[in-house]
Amino acid sequence: MNNGSILNCVICAALFSLLAVGMAAAQQKNFTDDNFPAQGGDIKITFIGHGTLMIAYAGKVIHVDPVSMYADYATLPKADLILVTHEHGDHLDGKAIQAVTTSRTTLITNQASAKNLSGASVMQNGDTRTIDGITIDAVPAYNPDKQFHPKGNGNGYVLTLGGKRIFVAGDTENVPEIKALKDIDIAFLPMNLPFTMTPEQVADTAKAMKPKILYPYHFGETDTNELVRLMGGEKDIEVRIRDLK
């Protein structure tokens, strides 16, 4: 078996495991959320599961990596904006996207995801767009030394809304482009091996970018207590653990 076949087997096995967990999670109707005071009203972030979020602000709804295994999207609010970080099945789901899409929905993806979707607007690493007063910066998301997430393919996104900057990293490691980000109020950083970061790498990233609030997400069975321990000396960074396995 060649390296490419082995890689595909690893990814498929991981996604199958996530599907098994997610099918049960999707039956859950009540998701938790946090609210953040902002200019023009509160920002509400709802924690759907794994790498999937819903953000509401000033009457606008943003779905990030909507995936049916984590929620029944037919019951969730329609989207003004959908962001897809990359094309893996635990981040890209055409059925979920269709369920929350209307004629006024803007769908933003990376190039590889757009091949599987109609009506997608592509953002490349480094691109910036403003939609309905929300500024979106596409940030590189990749593994430097592994094939799971090649450089130049996936996006993380910095959203600027209500005077706040929210960073959703996508699947990445502690790469220089992310560590160089500044003035981040809320950061979602992935924490699971072999696809993204160890707790040590998440702590390294957070200590460099210094978000006011850090959420580990996409963390599977990784011990979140280890991250809390590693961040114990960072008095200006609040670590919040939510149900984002």
Where are these regions (language model features)?
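Bacterial N-terminal signal peptides
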Residues: 10-22
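Core dinuclear metal-dependent hydrolase active-site scaffold
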Residues: 27-77, 120-182, 242-245
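A short acidic, amphipathic alpha-helical/loop segment
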Residues: 95-100, 177-180, 201-205, 227-230
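Metallo-beta-lactamase
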Residues: 158-209, 215-222
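Active-site environment of divalent metal-dependent phosphoester hydrolases
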Residues: 70-72, 88-92, 114-116, 127-129, ...
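Binuclear metal-ion centers of metallo-dependent hydrolases, dominated by the metallo-beta-lactamase
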Residues: 121-130, 203, 207-245
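Active-site metal-binding motif and surrounding structural segment of the metallo-beta-lactamase
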Residues: 63, 68-113, 182-188
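Bacterial N-terminal signal peptides that target proteins for export
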Residues: 1-13
